[in-house]
Amino acid sequence: MANMRNIILTALLSAIALVSGYVEGLDDKFTEFRQNELWLVEFYAPWCAYCHTFEPVWTEVGAELKSLGSPVNVGKIDTTAHTSIATEFNIRGYPTIKLFKGDLSFDYKGPRTKDGIIEFTNRVSGPVVRPLSSVQLFQHVMSRHDVIFVYIGGESLLKKEYYKAATEFIVHTYFFTASEEILPKAVTLQDVPAVAVFKDGTYYIYNEFIDGDLSSWINRERFLSYFQIDSYSLYQMGELSKLVALAVVDEKNPSEESIRYKTLMERVSTEYRDHYKSDFQFGYVDGNEYVNGLIMGELAMPSIIVLNMSIDGYYIPESSTETIEDLLQFLNSVLDGSTTLLGGNGFWQCAKRIFYKGKNTVMSMVETAPVFSCFVLGLPVGVVVLVIYATCTAVPADDEKPEEEATASPALDTHGKKAIESQPESTEKTSEAKKED
């Protein structure tokens, strides 16, 4: 029985060591060899609570990529031990995930899941723009991805702009090239070359005169018109010029009101797309945690809210939203400025947000790493206490002695007086001595 237990324990430890071996611990020397290979790297800190939660996921990512025969190496770096690395790559949050491809580095900003990270890795590590050579391949790609961009045509200035934009946005979505022959029969083009986005079960053609810069158009169109938005997608929308119209609901406890809010949002996103496509991104979020952090308060569920992610501002309807007309009226009031903007990035709001985030960070640190947190928080307090104690108990310097002598003058005067009174006796003795001589 004991032998069987030892065998199982040995096998378990061997499996853990084998899986952990797929993730390489890196140090400052990483900068010397990173350009020669593809690397997917996690930058973490020991005090980061989420980094500990995320560690098994990262191990799974390393094992999965290895089993798929991926050329991408997986590693991790402790930025508290290798501070120069954190400075060089401008690491500001934890965990930060970057893919290094030659001289370029790409930040992963999606959900911290194995599937999401592996999809990002496969997309970014391969060609920036991939050719679609057959109708079957086109249909296969369409079935696998919610949003794809396709360049149709031969060499042109538009193609150069397309490749440049693809390099910028490959971290978010897929880019392909195709000829007219392999497109679905339902797709009709006015001119070639052209750029199209396929999403929402249909397609939209880029028009330079209406849509403006190609890169900006791709940035606006890389999301579905209406979808479930998580905190990572919401964070990315700070890069858009759009406002984000949300139904905030609790999917675990659905209600008639929450279903109505979601339905209204979806209807507006499709039925009024041409009217609002440049101004609003529509969706819904499950839970109010991220929104609460943004507004620094508690938002009731279900609710409707419009976020301006570029300035951390938000709008809330002043009356109930019962019909699509009510929602349209609210959206129009946001655009014409008749609804009050709350929050924002003013001085006091920024100060309040810093305090709010700092408080949450400290609470998270104390909950997950109490000993380390006590050291980090107690060290500066201890230094201040020592400085105050040293100041209060300091020995007076030499230049302060005259003041002490001045305060002791009465005693000195007394002694001085006695010294003067004794002088006549010595004078008399001296005179008598002279007479005797």
Curated annotation (Swiss-Prot):
PROSITE patterns: THIOREDOXIN_1, THIOREDOXIN_2. A motif (Di-lysine motif) lies at residues 434-437. It comes from the Eukaryota. It is an enzyme of class 5 (isomerase). Pfam families: Thioredoxin, Thioredoxin_6. GO terms for cellular component: cell surface; endoplasmic reticulum; endoplasmic reticulum membrane. Residues 22-368 are extracellular. This is Protein disulfide-isomerase tmx3a. It comes from Danio rerio (Zebrafish).
